Structures are given as structure tokens and as C-alpha cells.
Amino acid sequence: MDMGNQHPSISRLQEIQREVKSIEQQVVGFSGLSDDKNYKRLERILTKQLFEIDSVDTEGKGDIQQARKRAAQDTERLLKELEQNANHPHRIEIKNIFQEAQALVKEKTVPFYSGSNCVTSEFEEAIQDIILRLTHVKTGGKISLRKARYHTLTKICAVQEIIEDCVRKQPSLPLSEDVHPSVAKINSVMCEVNKARGTLIALLMGVDSSETCRHLSCVLSGLMADLDALDVCGRTEIRNYRREVVEDINKLLKYLDLEEEADNTHAFDLGQNHSIIKIENVLKRMREMKNELLQAQSPPELYLRSKTELQGLIGQLDEVSLEKNPCIREARRRAVIEVQTLITYLDLKEALEKRKLFPCEETPPHKAVWNVLGNLSEIQGEVLSFGGNRTDKNYIRLEELLTKQLLTLDAVDPLGEEKCKAARKQAVKLAQNILSYLDMKSDEWEY
């Protein structure tokens, strides 16, 4: 239809659809809960558009009625997705774990408010356990769940960094106040810094509604000014003491700056952690090798060289410092599985090539197991290349293919032959490992 002659009702429906389309990505990526301001804003916009669509006069014309129906369906689909994102069982699981962390923080930060810098091992271990549980929440590759898990993890990891710093680096002093008049003031400031540390942790976890980032930042800047004004000339030990307290203040200010930017940036970016960077460098090299190996038709001369380098990558991952951080532990675990899966793929390819070159007499059951192993090798190559989520047709197809191979193995009767029994057991384990790897791939890890 010529745009100049288009019916006004059709034009209005198209305009509404453009408005709905403009917020679609916000809905798809919505990672909050149904009581969030942003949820209510998106819900209000979409509901308003539904009313607007409903008010369009179709004049009884079939084409306008169809256009109105399509526009309403698109809008209702987004409303439904918004509701599902906010109420997804795994989103609720993330919320419940975060609430546990909030309760823990409320209980364990009390000593900070008296000026103490004491962090119990119980608090430290409980935070680590919460982070570990969050890393195991399945997202199925769903954007909203990945964002929710990431945002929650970064908050709690920031708290963990703060309390780890307390454990790792207590100020080497305080000095006795008899040493110098400035020491009493530094001791007083250090007490205030410890109180601010507790307040910051409470702020990060959303359990202190009486404080704001801006006010706490002003308090810390004031303490910094007090320290700068002290005369500590010629007293190295006092100057060092002051420097340690200044460093503590700067660290807390850094967290405050990140928290204020949190809505617009990747605050507390785990990707900047030096251990994560090492893991990512290993994965980058592994992916380069994987692409080369999967593209090659039949490169047996490449297998040995590649396996040697891949074993070296496993060694590099073994050397990564975990820093008592479950996020790093999970990232390393997944990286080891990635590299080990590629090694297993090469081992199977080698075994299949060797069987072709040096055929030997096999019983029918043993031959059936080898046929399944050949199928598994082909499927594993596809799984290694997979990059989607569980709702993808390719995921479902690969899962069905692997299940079929397991059923085929289950039907093989070894007829009491030990060698065939062992081969079947190994093939079953391989198929299960590939299924597990496919599941992991559908839930890509984010930093």
C-alpha cells in the first residue's frame, strides 16, 4: 500500500509498535524483581500501549483488525516476558541467596560500628559459601538471569574484598599515644575509618537506608583532610602509620565511586581481577587451538603437538591464585573443563584413526561400541562449537543425539567379555561428560 494513502489507523498502530519495539531490549534484559522501580516503569509503558492499541478504531475493516491484533500480541508478549524475568524460579533463588547475605552482613558488621577492625573467620567463610552458591545458579543462557547473577555476585565479591583486606592487612601499628601528639589523632581517625568500613559494607548490601554514598564519601574525604593536616615531619614510623590509614581510606573511596556508577557501568568488574585475566588468556589460546583443530579435516600430526600445549595450559590454570574467591575457583574449574574436553576430543580422534590404520578382530558388541564412539566424536565436535542456550533448536538436537547414543550403549550386551564391558563403560562416561559440557556451554560464565 502506498504510504501516502495508508489508513490513519494503520499508521497509528505502526507508531505504537515502534514505541513498543524501542523498549524491547530493556524488557529482555530486565534483571530485577517485580517491586523494582524499573519493572513498574516498563509495565506502565506496555500497559499504556495496550490501551492505545485497543482504542484504535478498526472501522470493521479486516486488515486493520489483523494489524491491531498483531500489535496487541507483540505488546502482550513483552508484558509476559517482563513478568517471567522478574518471577523466574532462578531469579527468586538469586534473591533468596542475596537476602541471606544481607542478614549475615547485618549481624557481622556490628563490631565495625564500635571502631573495631575484627573480622571473624566465620564471617569470611560464610561470605565465600554464599558466593560459591551464586556461581552455581543456572541461567540457561537467559540474558536477564545472567545479568542478575552477575550484579549480585559483584556486590558480594566487593564485600568479600573489603573483609579479606581487613584480615590480610591490619595496620602494623597503632603506636602508643605517648610517642607523639599526632598518634592520638591518627588512632581516632582509624577508628572512624573502621566505622565507615562497616557502613560501606551495609551500603553495598542495601541494609543501611540511613546512609548515602555521597555522605559517606564526604566523611572519608574529611578524615583524609584531617590526616593531611597533621605535622609528622622527621618521624618515619608515624608517617608510615598515617600512610597506611590513608591507603585504607582511598580503598573505601574507590568502592564508593564504583557503587555510585553501578547503574551505568560494570561496577566491581571481576574481569579486571589478575587471576581472571590469567584464566581468560588461557581460554583465548585454547579457543584459537580449538578453531584450528575443528577446521582441519584429518590432522593426526597436529594432535600430539596440540595435546602437549593443552597440557601446558592445564598447568598454567593450576598456578592461578584463587585468593579465597569462589568466583575465581568457578572460573578456573570451567576453564579446566574447557581445556580437558578438547584433550579428550583429540584422544578419541587419535584412537579412531589408530583403529582404522590397524584393524583387528572384534566381537559384534565391541564393534557396536566403537560405532557409538565414532558418532560421539562427530557430536563432540559440534558441541565444542556450540554457543547458544537451552532453548536453541541446536541444543535440543545435540541433547537428543547424545541421549540416543546412551540408549544405544545401554542396548549393547557385552556377552561377558571384560574388554567390551570396559569399553562400553568408558563410552557411557564420555557421552555423559559431553552432555554435562553441553549443559555448561549453555550457561556461559560472565565476569
From Swiss-Prot:
A single GO cellular-component term on record: cytoplasm
GO terms of molecular function: adenyl-nucleotide exchange factor activity; protein kinase binding; protein-folding chaperone binding; ubiquitin ligase inhibitor activity; ubiquitin protein ligase binding
Regions annotated as coiled coil: none
GO BP terms: Golgi organization; negative regulation of neuron projection development; negative regulation of oxidative stress-induced intrinsic apoptotic signaling pathway; negative regulation of proteasomal ubiquitin-dependent protein catabolic process; negative regulation of protein refolding; negative regulation of protein ubiquitination; protein stabilization; regulation of inclusion body assembly
Keyword Nucleotidyltransferase in annotation: no
PROSITE patterns found in the cross-reference section: BAG (PS51035)
Highest taxon listed in the record's lineage: Eukaryota
Ranges for domain BAG: 9-86, 95-167, 182-260, 275-350, 365-442
SUPFAM superfamilies the record matches: BAG domain (SSF63491)
Keywords, sorted A to Z: Chaperone, Repeat
Pfam families: BAG
Tissues where this protein is expressed: Detected in brain, lung, stomach, liver, kidney and testis.
Function: Co-chaperone for HSP/HSP70 proteins. It functions as a nucleotide-exchange factor promoting the release of ADP from HSP70, thereby activating HSP70-mediated protein refolding. Has an essential role in maintaining proteostasis at junctional membrane complexes (JMC), where it may function as a scaffold between the HSPA8 chaperone and JMC proteins enabling correct, HSPA8-dependent JMC protein folding. Inhibits both auto-ubiquitination of PRKN and ubiquitination of target proteins by PRKN.
Subunit structure: Binds to the ATPase domain of HSP/HSP70 chaperones. Binds PRKN. Interacts with HSPA8 and JPH2.
Name assigned to this protein: BAG family molecular chaperone regulator 5
